[in-house]
C-alpha cells in the first residue's frame, strides 16, 4: 500500500526569483507528499552540488536538467519501492548518483525526492511529519535564531558579517518566542528609520542598513530589545553568523567595510571581545571553512562559554563533523538539508553531533520557498534550535507558523527548549 507509483518533478521559483526543484510523490494508497528544495547564497566549498542548466535561460540557473533526472532516472530507480523504507530509498539514490558530492544527479533532484517520499509515507501512516520522522519522543520546540540585521552576501551594505540574530531564550513557548521576536523586529525598524537608515530587507527578511561595523549593528539591536521591554541576555540573547569564508583571503580576514585585516588569531580575539561586550551566546562560521587552525584557536579561546557553530566548516556532512570532533573544533553543527542532499544523511549528522555532545541547529537557506519541512525536522530531532530568518517574508514566517501549529497539536507534551538548548548557558 505504501509503494511509490508516481514521481513528478517541476521547476518553480524560490524566494529570490531563481528556479528550484519541487517534487510530488504519490503512493499506491493515494498518499501524497510534496517538497521544494532551498538554495544558498554563501555556499561552502564542500557542499553537495546542485544541478543547474547553464546557458541563457534563467541566466544559467534553470533546473530543467534536475527535473528531467527526477522524472527519468530517479523514477525508474525507485518506482515500486516502499516509501516507508527511507534509508533504502536514499541509499539507492546516492548509489545511483555515484559521486562524492551528488554532482551527477544533483543534490537538488535527490533531496526533493527524499523529502517528498518522507512526506508521502507520513501521510500514509496518518502521522504529522515530525512524529513520523522523530517517533513518540519528538516534543521539543526549538529556540529560533531570528536574523534581524543582514550583511555580507545577504545584503548590499558595508557590514562584513552576514547575520545578526536574536534568540528569545527567556520565552516559555514558541508562540511567545515569536511574539518576542516580532516586537523587537518592529521596534528595530522604527529606530533605524528614526536614525535615517533605510529599512529595506535582505534575502532572509532582516534589515540591511548602511552601518559601519558589527558593533553598530549590535548596538541598534541591544537598544531595540530594551525599548521593546525585554532584558538583553535574560529574555533575549544575541547570535552572529560571520560567514567568515566569504572574507577570508590569502590567510587573513579582510573586512572591506571596516577597511581592516585580521590574521586568524586576531579574528578569534575580536570575536571573543564581541562575545564579552554583548550577550552573544552563539557564533556561526567565525572562522573560514578550511582554517582548521583558526577554528581550533577560537574553540580553545571561547568554546567553553559560547556556542561555536560550523556551517561551511561541516556542511551537514557526518565525515567532516567527525573530523571536527576528533580535532576539538567548534561545538555545534548547522544542519541544512540541501548541503548533504538527503533526509537520511541529515538525520545522521544530527545524531553524530548529539552523540559527541555537540548541539545541532536546524537551518533554512537564503533562497527559500513556502515549504516548511525544516520546522518539522527541528521538532523530529529534538535539536532545540532553528534558524529560519527574520519576522518578515512569508518564506520565513511559514516555518514559524508551522512551529506554532505543532506546539498547539502537541499540547501539554510540548516543551520549548529555551535557555537549555544552548548547553553552555
UniProtKB/Swiss-Prot annotation:
Binds a second Mg(2+) ion via substrate during catalysis. It is found in: Cytoplasm; Secreted; Cell surface. Keywords: Cytoplasm, Glycolysis, Lyase, Magnesium, Metal-binding, Secreted. Pathway: Carbohydrate degradation; glycolysis; pyruvate from D-glyceraldehyde 3-phosphate: step 4/5. Mg(2+) binds at residues 241, 284, 311. InterPro entries: Enolase, Enolase-like_C_sf, Enolase-like_N, Enolase_C, Enolase_CS, Enolase_N. It is an enzyme of class 4 (lyase). GO terms for biological process: glycolytic process. This is Enolase. It comes from Brucella ovis (strain ATCC 25840 / 63/290 / NCTC 10512). The lineage of its organism: Bacteria, Pseudomonadati, Pseudomonadota, Alphaproteobacteria, Hyphomicrobiales. The gene is eno.
Amino acid at each position: 500500500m505504501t509503494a511509490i507509483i508516481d514521481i513528478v518533478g517541476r521547476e518553480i521559483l524560490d524566494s529570490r526569483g531563481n528556479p528550484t526543484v519541487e517534487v510530488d510523490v504519490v503512493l499506491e494508497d493515494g498518499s501524497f507528499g510534496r517538497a521544494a528544495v532551498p538554495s544558498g547564497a554563501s555556499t561552502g566549498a564542500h557542499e553537495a552540488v546542485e544541478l543547474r542548466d547553464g546557458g541563457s535561460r534563467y541566466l544559467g540557473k534553470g533546473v530543467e536538467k534536475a527535473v528531467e533526472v527526477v522524472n527519468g532516472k530517479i523514477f525508474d530507480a525507485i518506482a515500486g519501492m516502499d516509501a516507508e523504507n527511507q534509508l533504502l530509498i536514499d541509499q539507492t539514490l546516492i548509489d545511483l548518483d555515484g559521486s562524492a558530492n551528488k554532482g551527477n544527479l544533483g543534490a537538488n533532484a535527490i533531496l526533493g525526492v527524499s523529502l517528498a517520499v518522507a512526506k508521502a509515507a507520513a501521510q500514509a501512516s496518518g502521522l504529522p511529519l515530525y512524529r513520523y520522522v522523530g517517533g513518540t519522543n519528538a516534543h521539543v520546540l526549538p529556540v529560533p535564531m531570528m536574523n534581524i540585521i543582514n550583511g555580507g552576501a545577504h545584503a548590499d551594505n558595508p557590514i562584513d558579517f552576514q547575520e545578526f540574530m536574536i534568540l528569545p531564550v527567556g520565552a516559555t513557548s514558541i508562540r511567545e518566542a515569536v511574539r518576542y521576536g516580532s516586537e523587537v523586529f518592529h521596534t528595530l525598524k522604527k529606530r533605524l528609520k528614526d536614525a535615517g537608515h533605510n529599512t529595506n530587507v535582505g534575502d532572509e527578511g532582516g534589515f540591511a542598513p548602511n552601518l559601519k561595523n558589527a558593533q553598530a549593528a549590535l548596538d541598534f539591536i541591544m537598544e531595540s530589545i530594551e525599548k521593546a521591554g525585554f532584558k538583553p541576555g535574560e529574555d533575549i540573547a544575541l547570535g552572529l553568523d560571520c560567514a567568515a569564508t566569504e572574507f577570508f583571503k590569502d590567510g587573513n580576514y579582510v573586512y572591506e567595510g571596516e577597511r581592516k585585516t585580521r590574521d586568524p588569531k586576531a579574528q578569534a580575539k575580536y570575536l571573543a571581545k564581541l562575545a564579552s561586550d554583548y550577550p552573544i551566546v552563539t557564533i556561526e562560521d567565525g572562522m573560514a571553512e578550511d582554517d582548521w587552525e583558526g577554528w581550533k584557536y577560537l574553540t580553545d579561546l571561547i568554546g567553553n562559554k559560547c556556542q561555536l557553530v560550523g556551517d561551511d566548516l561541516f556542511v551537514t556532512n557526518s565525515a567532516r563533523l567527525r573530523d571536527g570532533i576528533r580535532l576539538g573544533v567548534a561545538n555545534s553543527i548547522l544542519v541544512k538539508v540541501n548541503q548533504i542532499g538527503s533526509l537520511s544523511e541529515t538525520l545522521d549528522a544530527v545524531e553524530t553531533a548529539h552523540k559527541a555532545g555537540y548541539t545541532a541547529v536546524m537551518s533554512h537557506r537564503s533562497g527559500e520557498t513556502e515549504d516548511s519541512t525544516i520546522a518539522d525536522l527541528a521538532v523530529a530531532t529534538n535539536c532545540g534550535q532553528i534558524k529560519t530568518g527574520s519576522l518578515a517574508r512569508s518564506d520565513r514566517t511559514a516555518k514559524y507558523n508551522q512551529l506554532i501549529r505543532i506546539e498547539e497539536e502537541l499540547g501539554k507534551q510540548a516543551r520549548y527548549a529555551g535557555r537549555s538548548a544552548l548547553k553552555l548557558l
